[in-house]
UniProtKB/Swiss-Prot annotation:
The keyword DNA-binding applies. The modification 4-aspartylphosphate is found at D51. This is Transcriptional activator protein CzcR. It is found in: Cytoplasm. Residues 2-115 form the Response regulatory domain. Phosphorylated by CzcS. Keywords: Activator, Cadmium, Cobalt, Cytoplasm, DNA-binding, Phosphoprotein, Plasmid, Transcription, Transcription regulation, Two-component regulatory system, Zinc. GO terms for cellular component: cytosol; protein-DNA complex. It holds the Pfam family Trans_reg_C. Induction: By cadmium, lead, and zinc.
Length: 225
């Protein structure tokens, strides 16, 4: 799961990045409204945590632009605690509103609630051939066989399944799963794919994850390796 945090206070941003990363999320940080909006438009986030009082472009303006194009869950995290501000946030399309100072455990619970609501609009499960992924329960099956994955392996498989049939470059995978752009000479993505295949593909007759030479990887039951 990938989270965008739009927060201009460095210590708060660092605290959120550390806590969310330790909770299994890939976290991107924007320290002003303009950068936050640009990142929200360029990347497919699972949830956005948005401050209101931001330099350049405030959070009210950011969410207006986001809602004109996307239904990505947005949680306001702000020091503005007036009822009028909360009402304004919800009227502009926020999924939740939490006032600073806050307890991280409550923030995490609210994020998970936003994710549950978002996935219920689509599907809490993804299924391709006999590969089944329970997004909220973070469980994976091929047929009746349960497959144990690490957090990174789950994020990688979730990405491939959401973008079924689309060839994803190593750069795209690295950015979406690890939140960084690896040097093209490194084989971090290749190693991760190989480990994922060893669990999801190798023990089974039908292979789902395929290499497209010179381009990247794709999850597609119709292709042959």
């Amino acid at each position: 799961m990938r989270v965008l945090v739009v927060e201009d206070e460095p210590r708060t941003a660092e605290y959120l990045q550390k806590g969310l990363s330790e909770s299994g999320f890939v976290v991107d940080i924007a320290n002003n409204g303009g950068d936050g909006l640009h990142m929200a438009e360029e990347t497919d986030y699972d949830v956005i945590i948005l401050d209101v009082m931001l330099p350049g472009m405030d959070g009210w303006t950011v969410i207006k632009s986001i809602r004109s194009k996307s239904e990505t869950p947005v949680l306001f995290l702000t020091a503005l605690d007036d009822v009028a501000d909360r009402v304004r946030g919800f009227e502009l399309g926020a999924d939740d509103y939490l006032v600073k100072p806050f307890a991280f455990a409550e923030l995490l619970a609210r994020i998970r609630r936003c994710l549950r609501q978002s996935t219920s609009k689509e599907s809490e499960r993804l299924r391709i051939a006999d590969l089944d992924i329970d997004v909220l329960g973070r469980r994976v099956f091929r047929g009746t066989t349960r497959i144990e994955l690490t957090n990174q392996e789950f994020s990688l498989l979730h990405l491939l399944m959401r973008r079924r049939g689309e060839v994803l470059s190593r750069t795209t995978i690295a950015s979406q799963v690890w939140g960084v752009n690896f040097d093209t000479d490194t084989n971090v993505v290749d190693v991760a794919i190989r480990r994922l295949r060893s669990k999801v593909d190798d023990p089974f007759d039908q292979k789902l994850i395929h290499t497209v030479r010179g381009m990247g990887y794709v999850l597609d039951p119709e292709r042959g390796r």
